[in-house]
């Protein structure tokens, strides 16, 4: 039985420190991590974009593969982290350690599964994700490197989220940002100095993932955490593993549908050539960079929601939700406004192709307008998953990239052609936020007042 007294100060910080200050404290390191991750994703797009338009399109195709890997990683990561934060809020450290070890090793096994079977089926997988004949050679080379990094990528998602849900976002930031900075350096080395082409971008990403993985693992080895990844805590029974998976289903739904929507988007855009695929890929990466601001703050709110819900401090859950919503909307509003005004320059930075720029500008404008609606849906998703409302979290997480986006994309691309493809995500964002409203009202009406 692990003594609670050793971790008393961490518990008191999570349940007593003023909520706005705590969200900023936990959210800023996460936001920095998200920004760096987005920057190195955009760095790949920038350096690959110097090759040609087909290579630039390949980054959009492989983005679908990375979404699949992240879907599984986040399922185990958010599933484990959400349960851990509530267990720690209840001062049950033993159970938290069992969840942490089980989630980590399950993710590691899943990563090796992707490495083996993904490597064997890489060509049909790239075609399924929307690759054209001209994009395929670039996509295959890039994807093979990503698949080699699958064990690290998937299990890193678990370690990162365990650290965040414990309230140790700074340690998570060290691992992720170090890997991100290294990725950018290796991109320059492999692609500009050694002229390795898109293979260099893939190798840079793979090496960086393993370095990040090693740094995150070091935090657990050095016992900087309340939880442990020691094999003795593994508990692969149906109850434990099932609880992790069902709690993490919203993340699997969100990221899995992101992969499917990327595949459908690439296939729809492919009708208009490689330039359209490249343009939409660039727009998505820019949007994700802006989106990382509110996502970082939202992830800072997650451990606070889980800890305090477990400790029955419901007023702090309320305060956290509304502070995150207001702060996130302000951040995203400012960032979206700046990008809206400089849309052409932003796209040109990644690929100086008139056709790519022409297609990308309207899509980026639409995204910037719709991003004002995103903080509300993010706050809902983060809160419901953190407190164990599995149905609400899974359903709402499925909307933005799936239940709303996919039908809108299919209908709009048929009716409005290219313009429909350019605006589909923006329309889906507005729809998603509107659907979230009744869930939010019902939850806070029933939440005890303490």
Question: Language-model segments: which ranges?
Answer:
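Short alpha-helical transmembrane segments in multi-pass integral membrane proteins
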Residues: 1-27, 84-151, 193-249, 305-370, ...
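Residue-level signal for transmembrane alpha-helical positions in Major Facilitator Superfamily
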Residues: 24, 39-40, 76, 117-121, ...
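Transmembrane helical elements of multi-pass membrane transporters/channels
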Residues: 24-44, 145, 179, 208-212, ...
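Helix-terminus/linker motif at the lipid-water interface of multi-pass membrane proteins
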Residues: 35, 39-57, 126-133, 189-196, ...
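Small-residue-rich hydrophobic transmembrane alpha-helices
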Residues: 56-116, 153-172, 266, 279-343, ...
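Short runs within selected transmembrane alpha-helices of multi-pass transporters and secretion channels
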Residues: 77, 146-164, 172-180, 201-214, ...
């Amino acid at each position: 039985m692990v003594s609670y007294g050793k971790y008393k100060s961490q518990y008191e910080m999570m349940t007593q420190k003023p909520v706005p200050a705590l969200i900023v404290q936990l959210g800023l390191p996460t936001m920095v991590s998200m920004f760096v991750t987005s920057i190195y994703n955009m760095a790949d797009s920038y350096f690959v974009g110097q090759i040609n338009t087909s290579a630039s399109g390949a980054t959009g195709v492989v983005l679908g593969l990375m979404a699949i890997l992240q879907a599984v990683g986040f399922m185990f990561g958010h599933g484990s982290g959400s349960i851990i934060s509530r267990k720690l809020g209840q001062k049950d450290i033993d159970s938290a350690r069992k969840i942490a070890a089980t989630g980590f090793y399950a993710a590691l096994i899943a990563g090796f599964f992707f490495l083996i079977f993904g490597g064997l089926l890489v060509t049909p997988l790239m075609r399924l994700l929307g690759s054209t004949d001209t994009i395929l050679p670039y996509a295959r080379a890039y994807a093979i490197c990503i698949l080699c990094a699958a064990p690290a990528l998937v299990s890193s998602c678990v370690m990162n989220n365990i650290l965040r849900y414990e309230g140790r976002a700074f340690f998570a930031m060290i691992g992720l940002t170090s890997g991100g900075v290294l990725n950018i350096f290796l991109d320059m080395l492999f692609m500009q100095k050694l002229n390795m082409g898109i293979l260099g971008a893939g190798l840079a990403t793979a090496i960086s993932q393993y370095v990040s993985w090693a740094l995150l693992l070091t935090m657990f080895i050095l016992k900087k955490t309340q939880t442990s990844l020691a094999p003795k805590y593994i508990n692969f029974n149906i109850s434990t593993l099932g609880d992790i998976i069902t709690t993490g289903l919203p993340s699997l739904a969100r990221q899995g549908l992101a992969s499917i929507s990327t595949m459908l988007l690439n296939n729809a855009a492919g009708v208009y050539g490689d330039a359209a695929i490249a343009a939409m890929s660039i727009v998505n990466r820019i949007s994700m960079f802006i989106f990382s601001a509110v996502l970082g703050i939202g992830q800072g709110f997650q451990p606070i929601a889980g800890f305090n819900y477990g400790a029955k401090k419901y007023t702090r859950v309320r305060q956290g939700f509304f502070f995150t919503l207001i702060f996130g909307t302000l951040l995203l509003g400012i960032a979206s406004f700046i990008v809206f005004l400089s849309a052409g320059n932003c796209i040109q930075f990644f690929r100086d192709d008139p056709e790519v720029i022409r297609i990308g500008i309207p899509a980026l404008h639409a995204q910037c307008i719709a991003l004002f609606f995103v903080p509300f849906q993010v706050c809902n998703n983060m809160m419901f998953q953190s407190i164990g409302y599995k149905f609400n979290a899974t359903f709402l997480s499925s909307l933005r990239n799936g239940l709303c986006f996919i039908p809108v994309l299919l209908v709009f691309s048929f009716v409005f052609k290219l313009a429909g493809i350019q605006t589909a995500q923006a329309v889906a964002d507005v729809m998603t936020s509107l659907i979230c409203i009744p869930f939010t009202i019902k939850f806070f009406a029933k939440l005890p007042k303490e």
